[in-house]
Amino acid sequence: MQMISKLISVKLGIVASALLLGSCGSSTGNGEVAEASQSQAAAQSDGFVQIFNGKDLEGWDGDRAYWRVEDGVLVGEVTPENPLKNNTFLIWQGGELGDFELKGEFKITEAGNSGVQYRSDLFTEVPYALRGYQADIDGRNSYTGQNYEERKRTTLAYRGQSTTIQPREGELRENVERNAWKGLEVTKSLGDIDSLKSLINAEDWNSFHLVIKGNKLQHYINGVLMSEVTDEDTVNRKMEGLLGIQVHVGPPMKVEYRDLQLKK
């Protein structure tokens, strides 16, 4: 009987140890699941949803010679071996957007030129090209934060400006001067252009937040309002359209995006 009791005790000890080890492993796994669930719940609670899965280009369409996913990050790159002839865009396939907010983070090399395109049309003369509003981003931070309208009215607000855009008669090109729309009226200052530039990290991660409501278009970088447009040009403005990310023609460059969250 004593031998049987010892055997039972040993077996119970082994089972208890196994359960303890299983519990430890399970708690680590559950912790990771819980953390992911909490993050997802937080995103859902404030209405934002992820539109980039961090794994592949599912839900996006573009020239894969220039776009890829690497280490959970969306990468657009131009190399000496693979130059770019025209601006190209990675276009979100979730449909057209009207009023929305978009948050994310970007990092760009010094020679880089990129931007987040929104309320845009396909420019069918060039593959993967868009025409419309753009939250401008560049590696030297000369333009980062401004509102530039690709293939249309050009600059609608420089960094540090709150503007009202008025309609103009005649052809588009006749109403553009020094790469800015002649109907651009500065209504107030949001800050000195160079002081605002100092808030943007060179060749490092920055956050952006676009708040697009009706005819008011706001671009935030690192939580600071960089430009604001009230578009009164009922002839040329767009109230809905496509969303995309740009790689600009020019020297070799690399731009990275992550944590893209959309709220409609």
Annotate each PLM feature.
Residues K11-S23:
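Bacterial N-terminal signal peptides
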